[in-house]
Structure formats: C-alpha cells, structure tokens
C-alpha cells in the first residue's frame, strides 16, 4: 500500500514544493518566500531533472517534454521518496519476510510500478507527449526509479542493467 496510495498522497504533498507550488505561501498567496540560495539550488536541480526527461525518446524522433512535465516529475519523485521513508519508518523493529521471493523493499517498488502501468497505442503516446503535463506511465516509473538509490539496493541494480543510471547523472530534487 505504501508503494501505491502512499506515493499518491506524497505526490500531492510534493506539489506544494514543485516548480509551481513553491510560488505560494501557506495561505495560498502568490509570494516569493524562498531564500535566493534555496531558489537557486532548486532551479538548478529542477533543470537537471527536466533535461534528463527531455533526453528520452518516446517514439522515433520524438522526445519527452521534460519542461512541460517538470512539476509532475518532481511530485512523482517526491511522492516516491516520502512514501518510501514512511514505509521504512513504519517497518522499524519489525521482521519483514520475503513473499513470493520478493523482499519488502522490492514489493514497495513493484507496487509503485503497478500504479502507473499503461498499455497505450503509439498514436496515443504521441498525443499525450504533446498535451499531458504527466509523463507517460513508463517514464513515471522507470525514470523516477533510476534516480533513487534505494531502488538500486533493493534489486541489486548493476552498471550492466538496463535500469542503471550513473550516480553522477542521477537527480533527486527533494
């Protein structure tokens, strides 16, 4: 459940601190309440995440639009991290066993992957890439996970694995 509903809740919470939500204070007033240093760090990291998504081809000659999907990509990653931390905190001191050959951490990430699974036609991929502020389901899963160290540890991801992303290329906004 943490990998599914926990991620959705964390996603919505993170919108308060994404590229749009960060411009509003606790009362909903549009105001710059961040320090210049914090804003600069955020913008630099957010730009790296947008660029990372924009490098991905979703079809022949067509790339994802990391600028258009930035807020949702930040929220997806933030929701994933918030939920994972809550999951690990709830499990402290408990013996959690493998089920069907999967560790608790692996099941968390599998739950996350199932949340955004899609089976869509190529024409829909193109349409969504042009109009949707959400990344395609495959990117919401794979690209978010490729940036999260706990995913590498859970599945023992190695440099030769398809999901591997070099540590210096990984981007974590929050």
Feature roles, as predicted:
Residues 1-6, 16-174:
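Zinc-dependent metallohydrolase catalytic domains
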């Amino acid at each position: 459940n943490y990998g599914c509903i926990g991620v959705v809740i964390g996603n919505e919470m993170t919108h308060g601190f994404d590229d749009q939500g960060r411009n509003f204070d606790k009362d909903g007033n549009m105001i710059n309440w961040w320090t210049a240093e914090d804003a600069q760090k955020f913008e630099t990291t957010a730009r790296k995440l947008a660029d990372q998504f924009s490098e991905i081809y979703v079809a022949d000659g067509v790339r994802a639009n990391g600028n258009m999907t930035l807020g949702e990509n930040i929220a997806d990653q933030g929701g994933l991290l918030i939920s994972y931390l809550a999951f690990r905190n709830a499990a402290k001191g408990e013996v959690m066993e493998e089920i069907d050959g999967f560790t608790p951490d692996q099941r968390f990430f599998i739950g996350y992957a199932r949340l955004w699974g899609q089976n869509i036609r190529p024409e829909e991929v193109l349409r969504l890439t042009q109009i949707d502020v959400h990344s395609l389901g495959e990117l919401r899963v794979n690209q978010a996970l490729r940036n999260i160290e706990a995913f590498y540890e859970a599945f023992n991801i190695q440099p030769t694995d398809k999901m591997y992303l070099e540590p210096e290329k990984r981007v974590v906004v929050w």
